[in-house]
Amino acid sequence: MQFVAHDNFHTLEVRKVRYLHSRQVTFLLAGLLLNIEQFVKAIKERNNEFKIDIFLRSLLYQLPLHLGDHVHDDVRKSLLVPEPELCAWFSLQTGYAPASTSGRVNLYVPGTKTSRRRIIQRSLASNFSEKFKRFPECLFVGFEHFQRFLSIWTRDAERRLFSGCREIPVGSHTLVELANLGELLRVMVASEQFHNSRLLSRLAVHCYKIYGEDGFIS
């Protein structure tokens, strides 16, 4: 597993050169996070024009997709499926939109925020229609009640789409929390305690500090 910083795009690329067990993947990612400050320092020494904020956003965008299943299950499973709406959520919150991707997992999202919001809107509307099928009685309680029901759903969708998709800030605090997360993941791998409630609570706290209070990723 290789971690490559691209000078042209100021981004991080994670290359998987061979099959690795899920614990190995988590252990290597933990090592990157644990040493992220040194990694960033080495990049800046090599290329002073390198934009670290973009690099960090590209890392934050990819991290949940690489870690998703591995953190919650010590049996080899497929990666968290990067469905379009999931990638759109991640992209809006991290402020990063990859134009292309390498490997078998496609992380591409449209470049504009409007396009990404439309993906999420379609997903929310699809979920609404599926749930609506289970409660058809909403159609038979009168127009006023249905209108009120639809208004509540619309306000909730708008709140999730705009208030819940604020772009998170990145900076020195991000490096500190990523290192803390890496240290915790190392402990979880070494002790094989992926289901320990205390450690999972600590993991949630680190995600909260990295991705924010309203973070969909958290």
Curated annotation (Swiss-Prot):
GO terms for biological process: symbiont-mediated suppression of host innate immune response; viral process. Coiled coil: none annotated. Residues 63-67 form the F-box-like domain. Disulfide bonds: none annotated. Signal peptide: none annotated. Keywords: Host-virus interaction, Inhibition of host innate immune response by virus, Suppressor of RNA silencing, Viral immunoevasion. Belongs to the polerovirus P0 protein family. This is Suppressor of silencing P0. It comes from Beet western yellows virus (isolate GB1) (BWYV).
